[in-house]
């Protein structure tokens, strides 16, 4: 299974969103050598004013794979971006994990992951996706969702029109 979360994936996501002229949001990116490090999201109001909404920070490993996506939200009362949550990506031979950690403002640090999603190769053109959530009362994780995702492979269809 090859990594699907690369610099090119993040760049494509940004350009697809930014080029939709009818979208209610506007995007501003920090792009350096074809690599997106930050995206700011603003909502377009009816009076053509822009309202800050979200800010995303991206980090990559030496292979160009996404390792961290930090999400910040705009705090209107403080007039500044504040940490919200973080996705951390860990890559393995047969897939990758995505861990979600929430920001603890009292500790000024991210908590231990509250959710972990495992993406694993399950066969040709198939990926197993399992999500585990933290059970706070028992201090362990439980399986909350499991599915198989199949890629469309038109060349392997048995019938044609």
Which role fits each region the language model picked out?
Residues 1-10:
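Sec-dependent signal peptide recognition
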Residues 11-161:
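Buried hydrophobic residues that stabilize the cores of well-folded domains
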